[in-house]
């Protein structure tokens, strides 16, 4: 299992900015990419 996917599902991340627009159709991979660019993983 992908570590970032597991961290995302457990809510172990922080965001520096909130996403703009409609995120209801975002996949887990979309969120992981956004967190990589605009947040931090809590490991």
Curated annotation (Swiss-Prot):
Highest taxon of the lineage: Viruses
Name this protein carries in UniProt: Uncharacterized 5.1 kDa protein in Gp55-nrdG intergenic region
Lineage, opening ranks: Viruses, Duplodnaviria, Heunggongvirae, Uroviricota, Caudoviricetes
């Amino acid at each position: 299992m992908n570590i970032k996917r597991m961290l995302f599902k457990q809510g172990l991340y922080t965001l520096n900015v909130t996403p703009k627009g409609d995120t209801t159709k975002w996949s887990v991979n979309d969120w992981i990419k956004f967190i990589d660019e605009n947040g931090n993983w809590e490991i």
